[in-house]
Amino acid sequence: MSERNQRKVYQGRVVSDKMDKTITVVVETYKKHTLYGKRVKYSKKFKAHDENNQAKIGDIVKIMETRPLSATKRFRLVEVVEEAVII
């Protein structure tokens, strides 16, 4: 059980849910520039396993690292933190 707690957990926004049982999540983080010290925002996309197809585009979700589920999937959906407002 202690090994499970060391897995990476990210919070990000769903940018694609077109695939069956798979979502694409963009995670934005800040990194300090080594020379100038300014914080620079950068983003990275992860594909995550969504067993019940519950996450939709625009939702804020929490994903956790897991064993490789396919050629590109290394994360699974933990929970939908905030649902998107559809206008």
From Swiss-Prot:
Record-linked InterPro entries: NA-bd_OB-fold, Ribosomal_uS17, Ribosomal_uS17_bact/chlr, Ribosomal_uS17_CS
Disulphide bonds in the chain: none
One GO CC term on file: cytosolic small ribosomal subunit
Molecular functions (GO terms): rRNA binding; structural constituent of ribosome
Organism lineage: Bacteria, Bacillati, Bacillota, Bacilli, Bacillales
Subunit composition and interactions: Part of the 30S ribosomal subunit.
Keywords, comma-separated and alphabetical: Ribonucleoprotein, Ribosomal protein, RNA-binding, rRNA-binding
Ribonucleoprotein recorded as keyword: yes
Similarity comment: Belongs to the universal ribosomal protein uS17 family.
Primary role: One of the primary rRNA binding proteins, it binds specifically to the 5'-end of 16S ribosomal RNA.
CDD domains, per database record: Ribosomal_uS17 (cd00364)
Organism: Bacillus subtilis (strain 168)
Any GO BP annotation: translation
Encoding gene (name): rpsQ
Name of this chain's protein: Small ribosomal subunit protein uS17
PANTHER family: 40S RIBOSOMAL PROTEIN S11 FAMILY MEMBER (PTHR10744), SMALL RIBOSOMAL SUBUNIT PROTEIN US17M (PTHR10744:SF1)
